[in-house]
Design a protein with these regions (language model features):
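Bacterial N-terminal signal peptides that target proteins for export
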Residues: 1-6
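Hydrophobic h-region of N-terminal signal peptides that target proteins for export
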Residues: 10-18
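Extracytoplasmic/periplasmic copper-protein system
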Residues: 20-29, 125-147
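Low-complexity, serine/threonine/proline/glycine-rich extracellular segments that form mucin-like
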Residues: 27-67
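Short, solvent-exposed loop/turn segments enriched in Ser/Thr/Gly
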Residues: 34-39, 100-101, 114-117
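A surface/secretory-pathway sequence property marking extracellular, secreted
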Residues: 60-86, 133
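Low-complexity, intrinsically disordered segments enriched in Ser/Thr together with acidic residues
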Residues: 93-113
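Serine/threonine-enriched low-complexity regions used as flexible
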Residues: 113-127
Length: 147
Protein backbone atom coordinates (compact mmCIF):
# COMPACT_ATOMS: atom_id res chain seq x y z
CA UNK A 1 0.00 0.00 0.00
CA UNK A 2 2.83 2.39 0.85
CA UNK A 3 4.46 1.73 -2.55
CA UNK A 4 1.16 2.51 -4.27
CA UNK A 5 0.83 5.78 -2.34
CA UNK A 6 4.40 6.82 -3.18
CA UNK A 7 3.94 5.94 -6.85
CA UNK A 8 0.65 7.88 -6.97
CA UNK A 9 2.27 10.91 -5.33
CA UNK A 10 5.19 10.81 -7.78
CA UNK A 11 2.78 10.56 -10.71
CA UNK A 12 0.76 13.53 -9.47
CA UNK A 13 3.93 15.58 -9.02
CA UNK A 14 5.03 14.79 -12.56
CA UNK A 15 1.67 16.02 -13.90
CA UNK A 16 1.91 19.17 -11.78
CA UNK A 17 5.37 19.88 -13.17
CA UNK A 18 4.35 19.29 -16.80
CA UNK A 19 3.98 22.87 -17.94
CA UNK A 20 6.09 25.57 -19.52
CA UNK A 21 8.67 26.76 -16.99
CA UNK A 22 11.49 29.29 -16.83
CA UNK A 23 14.34 28.41 -14.47
CA UNK A 24 17.95 29.43 -14.06
CA UNK A 25 20.47 27.27 -15.90
CA UNK A 26 21.08 25.54 -12.54
CA UNK A 27 17.37 24.68 -12.39
CA UNK A 28 16.33 27.03 -9.60
CA UNK A 29 13.57 29.60 -9.34
CA UNK A 30 15.73 32.08 -7.38
CA UNK A 31 18.43 34.50 -8.48
CA UNK A 32 20.25 37.57 -7.22
CA UNK A 33 19.25 41.17 -7.92
CA UNK A 34 21.34 42.74 -10.68
CA UNK A 35 22.93 39.40 -11.58
CA UNK A 36 23.64 38.28 -15.13
CA UNK A 37 21.88 34.93 -15.37
CA UNK A 38 21.36 32.22 -17.96
CA UNK A 39 17.73 31.15 -18.00
CA UNK A 40 16.10 28.17 -19.69
CA UNK A 41 12.54 27.96 -20.92
CA UNK A 42 11.35 24.35 -20.89
CA UNK A 43 8.26 23.58 -22.98
CA UNK A 44 6.68 20.09 -23.01
CA UNK A 45 3.95 19.07 -25.44
CA UNK A 46 0.85 18.05 -23.48
CA UNK A 47 -1.49 17.29 -26.38
CA UNK A 48 -1.58 14.70 -29.16
CA UNK A 49 -0.40 17.29 -31.67
CA UNK A 50 2.69 19.39 -32.23
CA UNK A 51 3.45 22.71 -30.59
CA UNK A 52 4.21 25.17 -33.40
CA UNK A 53 4.94 28.43 -31.58
CA UNK A 54 6.14 29.59 -28.17
CA UNK A 55 5.74 33.21 -27.05
CA UNK A 56 7.56 34.41 -23.94
CA UNK A 57 6.69 37.77 -22.38
CA UNK A 58 9.73 39.23 -20.61
CA UNK A 59 9.04 40.61 -17.11
CA UNK A 60 9.62 44.34 -16.60
CA UNK A 61 13.15 45.17 -15.50
CA UNK A 62 14.77 42.10 -17.08
CA UNK A 63 17.42 42.93 -19.68
CA UNK A 64 17.85 40.18 -22.29
CA UNK A 65 21.37 40.19 -23.72
CA UNK A 66 21.57 37.11 -25.99
CA UNK A 67 20.00 33.80 -27.00
CA UNK A 68 21.37 30.34 -27.58
CA UNK A 69 20.53 29.03 -31.04
CA UNK A 70 17.74 26.45 -30.90
CA UNK A 71 17.97 24.13 -33.94
CA UNK A 72 14.71 23.86 -35.88
CA UNK A 73 13.30 27.13 -34.54
CA UNK A 74 13.12 30.64 -35.98
CA UNK A 75 13.17 33.41 -33.37
CA UNK A 76 11.69 36.90 -33.53
CA UNK A 77 12.15 39.55 -30.88
CA UNK A 78 9.97 42.55 -29.99
CA UNK A 79 11.62 45.56 -28.34
CA UNK A 80 10.25 48.65 -26.63
CA UNK A 81 11.18 52.28 -27.44
CA UNK A 82 14.28 51.95 -25.23
CA UNK A 83 15.50 48.90 -27.13
CA UNK A 84 14.70 46.41 -24.35
CA UNK A 85 13.35 43.01 -25.35
CA UNK A 86 9.72 42.69 -24.25
CA UNK A 87 8.71 39.51 -26.06
CA UNK A 88 10.29 36.55 -27.84
CA UNK A 89 8.54 34.21 -30.27
CA UNK A 90 10.03 30.89 -31.38
CA UNK A 91 8.42 29.10 -34.35
CA UNK A 92 9.12 25.45 -35.06
CA UNK A 93 7.70 22.05 -34.20
CA UNK A 94 7.81 20.18 -30.92
CA UNK A 95 6.11 16.85 -31.51
CA UNK A 96 3.86 14.95 -29.06
CA UNK A 97 5.79 13.32 -26.19
CA UNK A 98 8.69 15.75 -26.75
CA UNK A 99 9.87 18.93 -25.09
CA UNK A 100 12.19 21.74 -26.12
CA UNK A 101 14.50 24.02 -24.18
CA UNK A 102 15.28 27.60 -25.09
CA UNK A 103 18.24 29.27 -23.36
CA UNK A 104 18.81 33.01 -23.00
CA UNK A 105 21.01 35.33 -20.97
CA UNK A 106 19.57 38.24 -19.04
CA UNK A 107 20.38 40.73 -16.33
CA UNK A 108 17.97 40.66 -13.40
CA UNK A 109 16.37 43.84 -12.06
CA UNK A 110 18.48 45.60 -9.41
CA UNK A 111 15.54 45.64 -6.99
CA UNK A 112 14.50 42.38 -5.28
CA UNK A 113 11.07 41.08 -6.20
CA UNK A 114 9.13 38.46 -8.08
CA UNK A 115 9.50 37.91 -11.84
CA UNK A 116 6.48 36.43 -13.60
CA UNK A 117 7.33 34.73 -16.90
CA UNK A 118 4.23 34.46 -19.12
CA UNK A 119 4.38 31.78 -21.81
CA UNK A 120 1.85 31.20 -24.60
CA UNK A 121 2.06 27.79 -26.28
CA UNK A 122 0.38 27.44 -29.69
CA UNK A 123 -0.55 24.02 -31.06
CA UNK A 124 -0.94 22.84 -34.67
CA UNK A 125 -4.73 23.30 -34.51
CA UNK A 126 -4.31 26.98 -33.53
CA UNK A 127 -5.27 26.48 -29.88
CA UNK A 128 -3.20 28.40 -27.32
CA UNK A 129 -2.38 27.40 -23.77
CA UNK A 130 -1.67 30.50 -21.69
CA UNK A 131 0.86 29.71 -18.94
CA UNK A 132 0.24 33.13 -17.42
CA UNK A 133 -1.52 32.64 -14.07
CA UNK A 134 -4.97 33.50 -15.47
CA UNK A 135 -5.93 30.07 -14.06
CA UNK A 136 -3.12 29.40 -11.54
CA UNK A 137 -4.38 25.91 -10.66
CA UNK A 138 -4.48 24.82 -14.32
CA UNK A 139 -2.04 27.02 -16.24
CA UNK A 140 0.48 28.55 -13.84
CA UNK A 141 3.07 31.06 -14.93
CA UNK A 142 6.69 30.53 -13.95
CA UNK A 143 7.98 32.72 -11.12
CA UNK A 144 11.54 33.68 -10.23
CA UNK A 145 12.32 35.22 -6.86
CA UNK A 146 14.99 37.91 -7.20
CA UNK A 147 16.75 38.47 -3.87
Amino acid sequence: MQKFFMLSAALLLSFAAAHATVRTEAGTSESAAGKSETYRLNVPVEKDMATTQIRLVIPAGVGISRFQVTPGFARTVTKDADGLVTEVVWKGDIEPMEYARFFFQAVNPVQPGELVWKVYQTYADGSVVAWDDTQPDKTPASHTTVK
